[in-house]
């Protein structure tokens, strides 16, 4: 094989062997490796003109030690990226969890789906997570017992671990403390822990947190749980026998959707839940009498929880039986007509503002379709959540803005979580959480298996068969700035 040298620009490449049994294109490929000049750009001067890719070396007559000249421009050297590429498998677990857009599932420790689904729903409330993150032994109120303190800390730690992990988290520490605080969750049957009622777990956990998260010295935000979930009811009691009337107020953490053959929709069930009968002592009659109790909502929470009263005690079988009736519920819930007259008056102006903003938004979207410059429509204040309780708050919904407007509730709520039950009895079957993420996507948390769901699938959990059906729903308030 002849050895040649090639002059290119100011460089001379010596000692290049040419395999004359292969076409000249192979020689050009060698030069590409040495110079970076692609073969199609190489112009090599040989006897008879330019060297062709399929030329005949015998006809060209290249000789050992011959000097060849090449012209051509090399490709630009590819620069390393300014920011190194990081592959998903190389990310730390916490960063990977953030990229996924949803947190990890929870290991079922043996009939603990009631607890897992409760935790996943409550963990979706950012203000509750924030209150828990600020909780410490120093912030503990004197009237909070040790087990309540331990359960609050265990809740805080479990929420944090779920946010940091992509793999299923074992809630063993939380479960141990929950059973210590509430021994009923330790019941055994045939040597195994029994299935429990998710609503009872939800209620007991919220009650504990409401006691622990009270600020011992500050009056501002003194009861974080009440500010988030508390509903004040104004009730009128009427004795049918004596005609006596009285009124009372009470604070609850959820509304009840009572289910009967007349109830087909959540709104109807809520109306039934705000009316009822009870027996109490009548001062006029001097004995126990029947009273009719009618309640109206007098203040609104940031998160409205609704329990579908699906379980009742069945004497024949000595267990909690389940009402399977289908009860539809909306993605957007308006409870204006369930409010007291005073509260309605306070809601009128914010609701009018909300209608105007939504009308304006729809108008902008229409213009965008017809080629308007206003193609980017910003989220209205009504669609943004804001801190604050009651009917108004001085906290701005968009932190960092110069706006001095206050945020006001509208009586309109968006569905953000559903806890479902599948089965015929509260003490058996299976509980699952369905939670809306900040991105707007829905995730089903079936113990340790989170999976994406379509929004239309969420409204199909209304009952009527043996499929998952809503047992607890949680709605988030819409605010407007005024």
From Swiss-Prot:
Belongs to the peptidase C19 family. It catalyses: Thiol-dependent hydrolysis of ester, thioester, amide, peptide and isopeptide bonds formed by the C-terminal Gly of ubiquitin (a 76-residue protein attached to proteins as an intracellular targeting signal). GO terms for molecular function: calmodulin binding; cysteine-type deubiquitinase activity. It comes from the Eukaryota. It comes from Arabidopsis thaliana. One of its GO terms (cellular component) is nucleus. This is Ubiquitin carboxyl-terminal hydrolase 6. Residues 350-361, 371-381 have a biased composition (Basic and acidic residues). Changing residue 178 to K: Abolishes the calmodulin-binding. Pfam families: ubiquitin, UCH.
């Amino acid at each position: 094989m002849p050895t040649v040298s090639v002059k290119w620009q100011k460089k001379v490449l010596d000692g290049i062997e040419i395999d004359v049994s292969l076409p000249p294109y192979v020689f050009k490929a060698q030069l590409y490796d040495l110079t970076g000049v692609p073969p199609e750009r190489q112009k090599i001067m040989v006897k008879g003109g330019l060297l062709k890719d399929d030329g005949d070396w015998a006809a060209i007559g290249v000789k050992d030690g011959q000097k060849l000249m090449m012209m051509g421009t090399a490709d630009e050297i590819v620069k390393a990226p300014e920011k190194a590429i990081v592959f998903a498998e190389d990310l730390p677990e916490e960063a990977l969890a953030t990229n996924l857009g949803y947190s990890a599932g929870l290991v079922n420790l043996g009939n603990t789906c009631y607890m897992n689904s409760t935790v996943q729903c409550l963990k979706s409330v950012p203000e509750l997570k924030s209150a828990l993150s600020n909780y410490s032994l120093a912030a503990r109120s004197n009237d909070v017992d040790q087990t309540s303190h331990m359960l609050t800390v265990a809740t805080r730690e479990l929420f944090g671990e779920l946010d940091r992990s992509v793999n299923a988290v074992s809630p063993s520490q939380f479960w141990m403390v929950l059973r210590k605080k509430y021994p009923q969750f330790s019941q055994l049957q045939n040597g195994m822990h029994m299935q429990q009622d998710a609503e009872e777990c939800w209620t007991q956990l919220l009650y504990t947190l409401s006691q622990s998260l009270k600020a011992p010295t500050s009056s501002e935000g003194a009861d974080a749980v009440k500010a988030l979930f508390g509903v004040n009811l104004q009730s009128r009691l009427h004795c049918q026998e004596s005609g006596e009337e009285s009124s009372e107020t009470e604070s609850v953490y959820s509304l009840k959707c009572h289910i009967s053959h007349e109830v087909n929709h959540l709104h109807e069930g809520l109306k039934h839940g705000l009316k009822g009968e009870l027996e109490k002592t009548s001062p006029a009659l001097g004995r126990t009498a029947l009273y009719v109790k009618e309640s109206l909502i007098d203040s609104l929470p940031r998160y409205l929880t609704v329990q579908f009263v699906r379980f009742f005690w069945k004497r024949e079988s000595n267990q909690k039986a389940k009402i399977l009736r289908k009860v539809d519920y909306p993605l957007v819930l308006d409870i204006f007509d369930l409010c007291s007259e005073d509260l309605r008056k306070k809601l009128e102006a914010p609701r009018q503002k909300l209608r105007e903003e939504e009308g304006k938004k729809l108008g902008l979207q229409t213009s965008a379709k017809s080629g308007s410059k206003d193609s980017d429509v910003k989220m209205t204040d009504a669609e943004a959540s804001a801190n604050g309780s009651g009917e108004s708050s001085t906290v701005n919904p968009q932190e960092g803005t110069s706006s001095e407007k206050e945020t006001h509730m509208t009586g309109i709520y968006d569905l953000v979580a559903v806890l479902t039950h599948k089965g015929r009895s509260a003490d058996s079957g299976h509980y699952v959480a369905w939670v809306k993420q900040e991105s707007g996507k829905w995730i089903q948390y079936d113990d340790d298996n989170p999976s994406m769901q379509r929004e239309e699938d969420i409204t199909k959990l209304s009952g009527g068969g043996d499929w998952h059906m809503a047992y607890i729903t949680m709605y988030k308030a819409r605010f407007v700035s005024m």
